[in-house]
């Protein structure tokens, strides 16, 4: 199994590469790519960690050598948020980066599963889909927007509030991956109940958690370490499913039946070909139904922005 990380010299990329080097199954290959010249050195640094995961690093304009034979490609390349920016301010720079990298994936490893981490995910996934479609290699079961950070944050905040072990809590999060489009389904957490005020406060905290980190880092960056962990969790789940493990479920932002929007984050059963089954979002509370209705315009606009970027 070969995993390629594009944007591997950045804050998320390095954290992700470290976790994959220590946690990928024995015999896996890990390939790191970034435009930055430091990237082969990041691979050398990680190669000293004693795990049976082969690692190589590549830098420069051409990602092809890193992509050859890749089964999973995780894309974290792009600029990070600064205070006062929201994820959509990133669009102007990151849209071009994602388009370029996905074009290279389409040429070199068109059958790979692709996880898009680069923000704004609501839009960059639509860009990736249109690029793959133009290249004639789009498979909607193999393109994912990685929203796992919303899930791990939800799990952490709920566990803190309710005095649970974080490992015992799994909150499904649906919708998109920024602001109001992030909808944690708190009504579906088994064995935990919330007051209306708790639901409102938690939902808001989960939606604004990225900003919490950006502000706390005082201009020094955005959420890189928790995002690295989230991306590793998603990437490792995908690898296990591709290798035939049964019953692997993760939420991610994918193209579905279009009931709510063309792309929508929901629980997915993963399998040997990527998405095996898009699972139902279940029964929503009145608060959740309302929040879902209220986000769809924003989500659809975000998606249209990505489609137009490629097709203009």
Swiss-Prot record:
The keyword NAD applies. GO terms for cellular component: cytoplasm. Keywords: NAD, Oxidoreductase, Tricarboxylic acid cycle. GO terms for biological process: malate metabolic process; tricarboxylic acid cycle. It holds the Pfam family Ldh_1_C. The active site is at residue 177. Its EC number is 1.1.1.37. It is an enzyme of class 1 (oxidoreductase). NAD(+) binds at residues 7-13, 34, 94, 117-119, 227. The keyword Oxidoreductase applies. It catalyses: (S)-malate + NAD(+) = oxaloacetate + NADH + H(+). GO terms for molecular function: L-malate dehydrogenase (NAD+) activity. Substrate binds at residues 81, 87, 119, 153. Catalyzes the reversible oxidation of malate to oxaloacetate. Belongs to the LDH/MDH superfamily. MDH type 1 family. NCBIfam families: MDH_euk_gproteo (TIGR01772). Homodimer. This is Malate dehydrogenase. It comes from Escherichia coli O17:K52:H18 (strain UMN026 / ExPEC).
């Amino acid at each position: 199994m070969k995993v390629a990380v594009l944007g591997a010299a950045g804050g998320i990329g390095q954290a992700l590469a470290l976790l994959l080097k220590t946690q990928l199954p024995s015999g896996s290959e890990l390939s790191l790519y970034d435009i930055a010249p430091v990237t082969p050195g990041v691979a050398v640094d990680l190669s000293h960690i004693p795990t049976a995961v082969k690692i190589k690093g590549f830098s420069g304009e051409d990602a092809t050598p890193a992509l050859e034979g890749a089964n999973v490609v995780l894309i974290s390349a792009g600029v990070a948020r600064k205070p006062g920016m929201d994820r959509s301010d990133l669009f102007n720079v990151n849209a071009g980066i994602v388009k370029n990298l996905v074009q290279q994936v389409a040429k070199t490893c068109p059958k790979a599963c692709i996880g898009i981490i680069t923000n704004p995910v609501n839009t960059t996934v639509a860009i990736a889909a249109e690029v793959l479609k133009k290249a004639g290699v789009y498979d909607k079961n193999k393109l994912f927007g990685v929203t796992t950070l919303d899930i791990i944050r939800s799990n952490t905040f709920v566990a803190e509030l309710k005095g649970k072990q974080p490992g015992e809590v799994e909150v499904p999060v649906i919708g998109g991956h920024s602001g109001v489009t992030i909808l944690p389904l708190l009504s579906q957490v088994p064995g935990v109940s919330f007051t209306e005020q708790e639901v409102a406060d938690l939902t808001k905290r989960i939606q604004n958690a990225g900003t919490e980190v950006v502000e706390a880092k005082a201009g020094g960056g955005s959420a890189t370490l928790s995002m690295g962990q989230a991306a590793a969790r998603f990437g490792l789940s995908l690898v296990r499913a591709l290798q035939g493990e049964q019953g692997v479920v993760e939420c991610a932002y994918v193209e579905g039946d279009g009931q709510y929007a063309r792309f929508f984050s929901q629980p997915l059963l993963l399998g040997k070909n990527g998405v095996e089954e898009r699972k139902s979002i279940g029964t929503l509370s009145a608060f959740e139904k309302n929040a879902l209705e209220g986000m769809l315009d924003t989500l659809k606009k975000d998606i249209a922005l990505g489609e137009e970027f490629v097709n203009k």
